């Protein structure tokens, strides 16, 4: 079978303005809860797209660790490629794809670091191996497997079961200025609703052509 022959009909839901929440944060929470209830694998997995100072885009899967009306929070190494991208250009985009529900959510906005206290709280909730890994990994830098495991042993010997949060590791919050909710429909006539600020502490909702 050719790649061009692969196709699927989308028939699992609809998205209409009359049923959409007035707030995109409420609409996201509704869909996220439905993804969890449907046992979508890792419903908190999202694609994070960033752009560096030269305009070169890059994308990777990360896990959301919190969301509310202030934004969407994730944690990473500040010296990683995405961290360096965000230092140069704080504009970014998130994409959630819940394939079993034939839904995706795209969120655009500006990213800022969370407080040290918020980063500390989450870091100390992680399994020990993950905390030591944050020290061992010079994320995005070349390394051999033997070197990586030697660094993990080094920091395990140094900190035991109580490693502090590395200064190069912490959280970011994306503060949204645009949402798009996509629901697959038959004949590729998909539902797309875009939310943008209305300038009055609310949001406008527009239907986009599929």
From Swiss-Prot:
Residues the entry annotates as binding substrate: 7-10, 65, 122, 126, 130, 188-190
Keyword Flavoprotein: yes
Top-level EC class: oxidoreductase
Cofactor requirements of the protein: FMN
Enzyme Commission no: 1.4.3.5
Pfam families (UniProt xref): PNP_phzG_C (PF10590), PNPOx_N (PF01243)
Any one biological process term the GO annotation gives: pyridoxine biosynthetic process
Biological or metabolic pathway of the protein: Cofactor metabolism; pyridoxal 5'-phosphate salvage; pyridoxal 5'-phosphate from pyridoxamine 5'-phosphate: step 1/1; Cofactor metabolism; pyridoxal 5'-phosphate salvage; pyridoxal 5'-phosphate from pyridoxine 5'-phosphate: step 1/1
The protein, known as: Pyridoxine/pyridoxamine 5'-phosphate oxidase
Organism of origin: Bordetella pertussis (strain Tohama I / ATCC BAA-589 / NCTC 13251)
Gene name for this UniProt entry: pdxH
């Amino acid at each position: 079978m050719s790649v061009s022959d692969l196709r699927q009909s989308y028939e699992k839901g609809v998205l209409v303005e009359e049923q959409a929440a007035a707030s995109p944060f409420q609409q996201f929470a509704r869909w996220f809860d439905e993804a969890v209830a449907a046992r979508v694998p890792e419903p908190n997995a999202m694609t994070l797209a960033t752009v560096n100072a030269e305009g070169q885009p890059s994308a990777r899967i990360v896990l959301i660790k919190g969301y509310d009306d202030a934004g969407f929070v994730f944690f990473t190494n500040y010296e990683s490629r995405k961290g360096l991208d965000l230092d140069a250009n704080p504009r970014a985009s998130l994409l959630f794809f819940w394939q079993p529900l034939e839904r995706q959510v795209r969120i655009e906005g500006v990213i800022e670091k969370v407080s040290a206290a918020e980063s500390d709280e989450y870091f100390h909730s992680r399994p020990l191996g993950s905390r030591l890994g944050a020290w061992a990994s010079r994320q995005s830098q070349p390394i051999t497997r033997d070197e990586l495991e030697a660094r993990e042993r080094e920091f395990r010997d140094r900190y035991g079961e109580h490693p502090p949060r590395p200064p190069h590791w912490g959280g970011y919050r994306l503060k949204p200025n645009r949402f798009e909710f996509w629901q697959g429909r038959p004949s590729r006539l998909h539902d797309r609703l875009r939310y943008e600020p209305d300038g009055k502490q609310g949001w406008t909702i527009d239907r986009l052509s599929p």
